[in-house]
Amino acid sequence: MSHGFETTTSFHFYIFHGFSVGKSNQCAILIVSLRNQLACDKITKRVGKMDKRIYIIGAGFAGQTIADDIKRKKIFGKVNAFIDDNKDIIGTTIDGIPVLGPISSVTSILSNSELDEAIIAIPSAPTERIREIYETLTQNGFNHIKILPGISQVIEGTAHLVQTREIDPLDILGRTPVTISLKESLGYLRGKRVFITGAGGSIGSELSRQLLSGGAERLYLFGHGENSICGIYRELRLLQAEGVGEKATIVPIIGDMRDREYVDYIVRQTKCNVIFHCAAYKHVPMMEENQVAAVENNVFGTKNLLDAALAHKVDRFVLISTDKAVAPVSVYGVSKMICEKLVLDAAKRAAENQSFMFVRFGNVLGSRGSILPVFQNQIKTGGPITVTDEKMERFFMTIPEACSLVLQTGGVGENGKSYLLDMGEPIKIIELAKQIIKFSGLEPYKDIDIKIVGSRKGERLIEPLWLKEENPQPTKYKKLLMLDNKEYESSRLEKLLTELHPICFYTKGKENLFRDKALLVKLLCDDCESLRDFYEETKKDGQLRTDLL
């Protein structure tokens, strides 16, 4: 088997699991979606064989229906056989197609067969089942594998029914993502005007996709980057063309959270009912190099939005927060900690029918700049994969599940409350690196090396999700915890913002303070003990530039 990064041989399966013959509306929805995918495959095909040899794993209603489609539309290839666990049909034929089995014997079956491509389509199987079949295939040299969306994605309208995709490592990370009913959780948004900041980012764009099917009257996609806002706007319009949220009005808005007057104007003009505040500068090492920008954008951008929401009677305000706000050791982390305090302070001034809250969670897999795409790119270039420390670990959640829980929280959350998503158990980064290498059909340290490079500025080995005094308590909603708020005086917060403002914004009479990074760090360290201790310790170790303190 070649360990290069361009495959010359691929394999094509359709794997269906958990379906029986009957009048299932879910099956009908799935079959329509699969037919649409086949049609799009036909349209988007650039190169490849027209007589692909296909094996369908699963000989039930869904498998038979898609086999019939392939048979009628010969351009897609030819179904050579079904592979199934049903002893009653193994050894028989269905519409002239032999049924082989069981699925556990897939290796011996395929070793004596000729085939071309692999597409896993397990509409209702858990992650563990996908992992089992995937590993069986890859361990026997079948490495170019694709996957079709699951039935829950199709029903909820979150699946991109355009074409098959390369299998995503999220499918085999060993934990089944949390699923909730969007129809139930988005009831509070029906007929409402929803404003999403950072709508072009990883979290903001996924929130926008899920919101589209929630019955909102209008979606305002607010962001600073025109390319990312244009991208999500076009994507949502395509989804509307497929019948998802077709009645909603989608409005792209280019703007800057730091522009106080414009933020107030746009909130007033849109008359939005709900705000999901996702916008933030988030890359820790980058923000350690641009500390003033982190505070200017994250802190004052959030304050501008909160003030506008209070002034113009926005019903619900939900801040997306991060585990890096817990006993922060970076300027980014401190900026998000201050944002949490700003939300709780706004809640004290909220009108009776207003609710301000934040939702905190750890890392999401697959976001722009996160370790997953970084590792994948490092593998594509031949390695090595770079890991900070063998002991480093993080909590992970998929973007769709995090966003669905955020949307649920927006509906059930109470004014002035703090919420935390249950992230499960932490994952060691080095183990994740090994997993991604194996997933790519390669061997860690043999084909792709793993290099330990040491901590970067603002990083720590373990990121806690809460402080001891926050005492997380379960709610009646799955994977949603409530925190006890840590007391913080409003006057202290106001004083800190007053001192930080002339550093971030040019102020007459205080010109000498503008962009004074050393003063900004000193003010933050004076206010945040964990940041001060971390900076002092790293300074002793010679890891921190002298101009930071």
PLM features: what roles do these ranges have?
Residues 254-271:
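Conserved Rossmann-fold cofactor-binding substructure of NAD(P)-dependent oxidoreductases
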Residues 131-148, 218-225, 268-269, 289-316:
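NAD(P)-cofactor binding segment of oxidoreductase domains
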Residues 54, 179, 184-188, 345-363, ...:
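Strand-loop microenvironment adjacent to phosphate/nucleotide-handling motifs in alpha/beta enzyme folds
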